[in-house]
A protein has these predicted regions:
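Short, cysteine/histidine-rich loop/knuckle motifs that typically chelate Zn2+
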Residues: 8, 228, 284
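Active-site flanking residues adjacent to catalytic metal/cofactor-binding acidic residues
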Residues: 47
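N-terminal pre-triad scaffold of radical SAM enzymes
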Residues: 1-12, 39-44, 231-235, 239
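Radical SAM enzyme [4Fe-4S]-AdoMet core and its adjacent flexible, acidic
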Residues: 101-232, 237-238, 242, 251-254
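Radical SAM/AdoMet-radical enzyme domain recognition
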Residues: 27-43, 52-155
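Flexible mid-to-C-terminal extensions adjoining Fe-S/redox cofactors in radical SAM and related proteins
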Residues: 12, 238-299
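Canonical Radical SAM [4Fe-4S] cluster-binding loop centered on the CxxxCxxC motif
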Residues: 1-25, 244-245
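The −1 position to Zn-ligating cysteines in a subset of zinc-ribbon hairpins
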Residues: 1, 5, 225, 281
């Protein structure tokens, strides 16, 4: 469920047909992961995650279950100023990182900036992704520059149609692509806050420019060994637990094709979970999701 309807996002994220997980099922999954993975990174994606009425309660209860958990909440930052003040006052700075994304076609830039300011001032670890929709280039860049006075990480991001693995949306000029690469090479990756959260991508122990890799289509790890499924898990809208975002299925009302079932690790609604015991060989052509990319892998 989402309150935006961005043209580049899949329709199922904002068509209103899929709601939120049951509170107890979500907590069950945190408990299961915490049994043998005490240092846990838990990413919450949408739709718009902060529309979940149980969000603040869930975060606080998850921290009670596992004091070492780090929860990343992905949000478009569009809730009211009062909502974000209430969230900031929950005092979970050690355990929560906030990953904002600015979508210029729908989001009020002043509201977005004010909400960034609120959580950053409260000491939360905050990153802001400025989604570069070509018709809004100037609007996006202006707000990105405006946030440079805030203690946050800020970067301009490429957009892919419907989360395609390697294509970019139409409308990018070479000047825009060069600007994205250049701004992702600066020092804006330094993110302040109490939570331990490193989202830089490394290759052979050297940091790389991930946006540049995607533009140049150098983001393939096919046939590499990967810890997805043993250390990294992705839960789709229908509760299916899978190794990563590329090995998931949203088709057919959540019923996977026969060939997809081999990558099914369980379902949180059925309270069934069977992680892999070792690395898998990557079967996909491209790995566009940054969180999938930072998952340990080798050739």
């Amino acid at each position: 469920m989402c309150n935006f309807a961005c043209a580049y996002c899949p329709e199922y994220l904002h068509d209103g047909k899929v709601g939120f997980p049951k509170y107890d099922d979500a907590l069950w999954f945190v408990k299961e992961l915490s049994k043998d993975k005490p240092d846990l990174f838990f990413e919450i994606l949408g739709g718009e995650t902060t529309l979940w009425p149980k969000m603040i309660s869930f975060v606080n209860e998850a921290v009670n279950i596992n004091d070492n958990i780090v929860i990343e909440i992905n949000t478009n930052g569009s809730r009211t100023r009062n909502w974000w003040k209430r969230f900031a006052e929950s005092n979970v700075q050690k355990n929560v990182v906030l990953n904002f994304s600015y979508h210029a076609a729908f989001c009020d830039p002043d509201l977005y900036y004010d909400n960034l300011f609120t959580v950053a001032e409260a000491g939360y670890t905050v990153a802001s992704n400025f989604m570069l929709d070509p018709p809004y280039f100037d609007k996006v860049v202006d707000l990105w520059k405006r946030t440079h006075n805030l203690p946050i990480g800020a970067s301009i991001k490429l957009l892919r149609p419907g989360f395609d693995s390697h294509k970019l949306i139409d409308g990018y000029t070479q000047e825009m692509l060069d600007y994205i690469v250049k701004t992702n090479m600066d020092d804006r990756h330094a993110i302040e806050g109490d939570a331990n959260w490193d989202i830089n991508v490394f290759a052979d122990e050297e940091p790389i420019n991930w946006q540049e890799r995607v533009i140049e289509k150098k983001h393939s790890f096919k046939f590499w060994y990967c810890s997805a499924g043993s250390k990294r898990f992705h839960v789709n809208l229908f509760g299916d637990i899978r190794p990563c975002s590329q090995l998931t299925s949203y088709i057919n009302d959540g019923i996977p094709h026969e060939e997809d079932k081999r990558y099914l690790l369980g379902n949180i609604f059925k309270r069934d979970f069977r992680p892999y015991e070792d690395l898998i060989v990557c079967p996909v052509d491209y790995c566009p999701c940054k969180i999938d990319a930072i998952c340990y892998k080798h050739d």
